[in-house]
Design a protein with these regions (language model features):
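Beta-strand-centric surfaces of beta-sandwich/beta-rich domains
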Residues: 1-28, 35-136
């Protein structure tokens, strides 16, 4: 399942100490991949971090954040969302005094991770194999 969110962060409104908070609500499963797209234009003014509950998960070092221009950051989180709330919080702030800036984040979640696959029994695919109906 893919979750895509576009976040516009207004200039002179949010800061590192008071960032914009955007929730990405998902379902139970494992986050297996994702990417963050910074279009050309922010020139390092648009900053972003990803939180899971109170913990920063991207970038993993809480002293760092993403602030890029015309770049795609590939994510390979590989962690499970097995307890509610099934969501991530995206923190963004814009240090530009003139322009709003936008980024796009996409996350791929495998809702079936850890569950045995549902496979039909052979007898449902081949009626002649059903009990008491085998013909030789």
């Amino acid at each position: 399942m893919d979750y895509v969110t576009t976040i516009n962060t207004e200039h002179s409104t949010y800061s590192a100490t008071d960032p914009k908070r955007t929730l990405i609500r998902m379902t139970r499963g494992r986050l297996v991949a994702g990417w963050i797209y910074f279009p050309s234009g922010p020139a390092g003014h648009l900053h972003m971090t990803v939180l899971r509950a109170a913990y920063q998960v991207a970038p993993i070092d809480p002293q760092q954040g993403y602030a890029l221009d015309d770049a795609v950051v590939t994510l390979a989180p590989g962690f499970d969302l097995h307890q509610p709330p099934y969501q991530l919080t995206i923190l963004t702030w814009n240090t530009s005094t003139l322009y709003d800036h936008t980024l796009t984040i996409s996350l791929t979640l495998d809702p079936f991770f850890g569950k045995p696959p549902k496979r039909p029994f052979l007898s449902s695919l081949f009626p002649s194999l059903r009990k008491n109906k085998v013909e030789l």
